[in-house]
Amino acid sequence: MSSSSSIKLQPWNDFIEWGRYSIPGSQNAITRMEDNLNFYSGNYIAIVAVVLLITLFTNMNLLVAILLLGAIGYYLFFVQKGDKNIGFAVLTPMIQMVILGVVSVIVIYKLSGLTLFYTTLVSLLFVLAHSALKMRNLKNKASNFVSGIKNDLKNELK
């Protein structure tokens, strides 16, 4: 069975449905997680984004720093593409990305302590726990199977 590559937001009442949770057997856990991560990917992205936005809006210094780092990244990688000559050194885009990443981690750590990292970690743990414990109903599995077949047919007809 092929999985759909598009990200769709599934209905929230189906996502939350309290009667559909159980602890999977060790053989079933990975399959259930893969299925749920594919099927509910839009919902998971929305949850992580909302939690991160709440964290950013409660810490204005961090929000300004993130926007500034994003603007610097945009300038480096989209406005002024290519190598940069700084004195005796040539900075390739990969080196620029590493430097920006290290500076970003340091700035975020200094401004938020570990709040942003903990927020991200808790969000991802929620996603993994939900994907492992949520049993999808037969209707959802059939819908996913049909969309996979449609995608396979589209790819073969191209």
From Swiss-Prot:
The keyword Lipid metabolism does not apply. One of its GO terms (cellular component) is Golgi apparatus. Keywords: Membrane, Transmembrane, Transmembrane helix. Its main location: membrane. It comes from the Eukaryota. The chain crosses the membrane at residues 36-58, 62-79, 88-108, 113-133. It is a multi-pass membrane protein. InterPro entries: Prenylated_rab_accept_PRA1. The keyword Iron-sulfur does not apply. It is found in: Membrane. It holds the Pfam family PRA1. Belongs to the PRA1 family. May act as a general Rab protein regulator. This is PRA1 family protein 2. It comes from Dictyostelium discoideum. The gene is prafB.
